């Protein structure tokens, strides 16, 4: 399956886009974007696809995703209830020039 390019909302002057997803299912298609991302699962379970890794997910999972790495979360077909997550996406260059963030930058580049 070919990943689609997601256009992340870049209207925030800080370069950070944060939101809470809430719906009946995690239904975002297999996608990628140049921004880094943290996804924290608040409610729901199913299968997480990140790059060439396929894993189960459950509430409390926190995943860091590197830029341009394809990913998506999928609930099982018989899933009922609510799917909720906190998603934080940021441009790669917002921490690039700050020395205090160098260890984080190195970690993100390996993600």
Would you name each region that the model predicts?
Residues 3-10, 66-111:
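A hydrophobic/aromatic-rich effector-binding and dimerization subdomain
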